[in-house]
UniProtKB/Swiss-Prot annotation:
Interacts with EB1. PANTHER family: TENEURIN AND N-ACETYLGLUCOSAMINE-1-PHOSPHODIESTER ALPHA-N-ACETYLGLUCOSAMINIDASE (PTHR11219), TENEURIN-A (PTHR11219:SF69). PROSITE patterns: EGF_1, EGF_2, EGF_3. Glycans are attached at N552. SUPFAM superfamilies: EGF/Laminin. This is Neurogenic locus notch homolog protein. Keywords: Cell projection, Cilium, Cytoplasm, Cytoskeleton, Disulfide bond, EGF-like domain, Flagellum, Glycoprotein, Repeat, Signal. Residues 64-104, 106-146, 267-307, 353-387, 453-488, 546-588 form the EGF-like domain. Gene3D superfamilies: Laminin, Tie2 ligand-binding domain superfamily. It is found in: Cell projection, Cilium, Flagellum; Cytoplasm, Cytoskeleton, Flagellum axoneme. It comes from Giardia intestinalis (strain ATCC 50803 / WB clone C6) (Giardia lamblia). Residues 1-19 form the signal peptide. GO terms for molecular function: calcium ion binding.
Amino acid sequence: MIFVLTLVALCTAIHCPDGEVEVDGACYPSSCVFEDTVCNNHGTCTASVCRCDSGYSLGNQGCYPSICYLASDDVCNGHGKCVESEHGSYECSCDQGYINDYQVCVPEACYTEEGVCFGYGTCIQPTDGSAPYCRCYPANAGEKCTECSSEAVLIDGACVHKSCLTEFVPGETLVCNGLGRCMIMPFPNIHYVCSCYPYDGTFYNNTCIYNGCITEYNLYGITEVCSDRGICAGTRCVCDSGYNGPTCEYKVVDCEPGFVSAQETCYPEACISDESVCGGHGRCIWNNDGAACACNDGFVFYENTCIYASCIVNGIVCPHGTYDASMNPPRCICPTDYIGRNSVCYPSSCVTNSQTNPPQLCHSAGSCDFDTGVCSCNPTNSGPTCEECSSEATLIDGVCQPWSCIDERNPDALSVCSGKGTCIAYSGRDVFDVCYMCSCDSGYETVPGGICVPNSCVTASLIICSNRGTCTDGVCKCNEGYSGALCEWYQCPTGQTFVNNLCVHEECVTSYDDVAQTTSVCGGYGRCVEDDGSYKCSCRSDAKVIDGECVNESCITNSATNEVCSGHGKCNGYNCVCSVGYFGKHCNVKTL
């Protein structure tokens, strides 16, 4: 029996060829088998290679979520495990001594919130088991590269290598001559070069030369700067002694007092700015009365020179920018953190749509401080660029609308001013005191609660249908029991009449034939009480029941016969209301 079982086992065992491995009763190339599975159960083996499922990538450990293979071909760069998060996605769970930095397991010794080795170095992990450390780029130093080395200078919070610095003018140190950025280059050896801003500068002698300083060049590059008679410092030529002009092209001549050498000629000082005559866009005219520039078309005289008119905004030349007269036509050059449109430099931090002209600022929901680049939001908005709704507003059709203008009668379909008006901001006494109210269309009335209602449905006290109905197509549809154009009347049950906002049994109602056709309960001198299923008046002590109503004693002219107002009128309060043809206190005088 034992022999038979052994024979069966030998007959059913699978023997895979060399280079293949048995998995679940089948043979697969060993290159596709990981952790005793085929492609980690997240791919298929094709031509001895795992083709991973969507969202997975092939690495040294097989098919794993792509996010866990970001840094190397090892899962979590060999210092962690790929685990499923509580949200269903995957992430690296790093080993002790390592920190997850955007799904890369970084040694704590190299980690900073600003990046690995502060973003200015490489984390070295020795193979001999010694502690990891930061190898800083030449411009940086310190345990985690957070300091500047002796080869660099701290400028605007960054360590700039001295090879990128220029100081053509004593005391005026510029990064790449103020026209570029200092970039690190890894090959062939780590070094720094200037990357010049397009249209502003050209790389020359390891710095950026302002294009307006270039006086000669050929197919191979720049051959002459500032006419070889000066240096280009920033956006201007600083000429050698004895020369002047925008590119040092003129010799200086001796001039009389009040005159200045320009273009190798003497001109009145009133026409000279930056050593040019009228900015190169006009003629200098002078006589015994003085001197001034006659500017070309499109230019205006401004502080001894001719300025391109489009570059002057509110009386200021290129606010927050630099006027570049070397261009044709001249233009405003904005700093790197500003965006230029129509000679205006807008802070980039405020610009929320650069495709419009002028660009949209602060999502059109606030004002931008051009000096600080900070948005001051309207009361309806909040956030760095006013992109969110404040607690005083809600989002409707992409716009933060103030609650004071929102019709909330239908919570599932909020509307602004009921769709029949415009929400207007009104300023209070304080500049920051702003309130919002609906300005309704013609034929509509503004009602508290952001509601615009047809005039025909609103009472004098701005109540819709007297709070007793709904307004539909300009007509009040009254609730049950009410009537009238504004639902102002209450419909009493049969046998009752509406008197003084109450339903009163008709047996107790007194009517008067006066001009106002007034009514009262029991003549105003009693109350209506039930008596064996019917109703009657119960009078005050100074009144008497006569014909079912309470009559004040001052109106009774014969108590024995219950005569009221001499039989020619009715009592209304303390007075007689005489019938036609009679007058007098007790209606006892007949009209002639």
